């Protein structure tokens, strides 16, 4: 009897120790996330504004949704609906600043690092924190983050990492995937699909690897697991379709999110061309994101080495990378933040370093590399900077007519709407990549129909006889000096 009670006591003590370790880890990772996002994200309160056009477009749509505007129908952009819902939540926290986006970024990085920590514990890694700090710094100081923060790729990282960790946990334990596992993977894949469907190459590779593993591990559960994952995937999709149907704009959602994206970013025709572009993309990103790419590449091969006796785990990494990379870069558009999901592989570098170095050396190495990475961040030099063309133009508009409408005609939404609390009255309220002539004509029609009083352009002189140039300023965007112009309508009807 005494042995039984002693055994129970040891179990309780072990559980208590594990919970204390988890609480300590969570607190440390939250602190790292808070530090990194606060210092390096332009959404942080240390910066006057986040000037990145994409993040401002997302937030403008989120703010518009709170005022009754419909995504895709009333305000146009071509990312997934779940992203705009996240930005609507951010706008609920603050509709005149990026405070809500900042909080979402902190939580997103924390969740990602938490998943990395769980994986490192699974791999029995000693001293994981120096490596996790370095990974966090590598993310927020990379060129992929220098636009300002708040990209789809950044917010999708924890979802991708959670599925990777869950899959490796089952494979390394040689366990079959449960109903809950398959359903959850399906839900998370659907969530990413509803943010940016080209990221789902990650899940295509994961699905192939898990089907092969499950077929060997417990073939009788294979079909059930596939159906459970499909069911999980369909839940968010069907809810989305239902909500758009009830809102009366399902056709706009389908035309924009699928029709526009598939037509404006066509895949290359031949396999050789695709392979060439994939190779070219890697060297483009190596040049623009050297630390992130090197960490991730070395981490990828470190993971393959780590699992050399676990072919299912090794194949999982290879298939995820190939499918994600292939689908992401078969086109001819390379933008810095597209590569950000590759950082998921960097975590496999930490166990190898941990085995070869003691804690003090790891801390010193992590601190030194973190400082070097920080010097490469283009965001840091704008901390505390005050005064902007957005503030000047909006102040001028409001001094003439506090309730006057204004629109970006030639240029990106860089916070002009946010500065004045303006909800655009035209569907095409900002320039976007691959803009069509139809969009430009519809924007001009909206300007005339709704008698927009003020127009703002970037690097373009407007040739509109009914508008006069009233102000011109230079400002920095994407590392280059731009010329901004403010026009006023001559005669309002």
Per-region residue spans from a language model:
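Hydrophobic, aromatic-rich transmembrane alpha-helices
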Residues: 32-35, 114, 287-325
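Transmembrane-helix motifs of polytopic, lipid-linked glycan transferases
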Residues: 103-124, 162
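Transmembrane-helix signature of polytopic, membrane-embedded enzymes
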Residues: 116-140, 157-158
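Membrane-interface transmembrane helices that cradle and orient dolichyl/undecaprenyl
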Residues: 121-126, 161-184, 291-292, 297-313, ...
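Short acidic/glycine- and proline-prone juxtamembrane loop motifs at membrane-interface regions
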Residues: 145-155, 335-336
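Membrane-interface alpha helices of multi-pass inner-membrane proteins
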Residues: 180-208, 235, 321-330
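Hydrophobic/aromatic-rich transmembrane helices and adjacent perimembrane loops
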Residues: 201, 325-360
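Short periplasmic/luminal acceptor-recognition loop of GT-C membrane glycosyltransferases, typified by
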Residues: 382-437, 441-463
